[in-house]
Amino acid sequence: MPVTDTTEKRFEDDITGYLLSEGGYTRNADIYDPKLGLFPATLIRFVQRTQPKTWARFVNMNAVEPERKFCTVFNNACDMDGLLHVLRHGFKHRGISFRVCYFRPESDLNQTDAGHYAANELCCNRQWFYSKHNHNSVDMMLSINGIPAFAFELKNQFTGQSVENAKR
């Protein structure tokens, strides 16, 4: 009878493998910016692809470092309205409305809505170093369009770990 690998790494491998093969996720090759709390290149790419005219207006109004400015404006909107609200409804800046993700349309009749939904980038990252203050990490993080949405520690009862270990 083969020995079952019950290590945390194997657990991570299994979850990551499933998300990549069956869940529509990819690995995020872009660089995470802990100061912004985002994968800025991923978020900017999504906005440029799905809202090119809106992005052009924003760049015209913010000619110096528009990408950095956009990420700052996004973070300010999240601080004011909350991340879930911004994910669901987007945000406005100086009269310009932005969406940072699109939900599944009720039908595929509207090709624009279907295309926007298909443009979402779902990514999983392992050993996510989230802090600008230290080198702490969590086992896995899921993001949508460069926005960290769900981070979690994996613990395995077969190795004697519990939720208490994750709290440390």
Predicted regions and their residues:
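An alpha-helical interface "stripe"
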Residues: 1-168
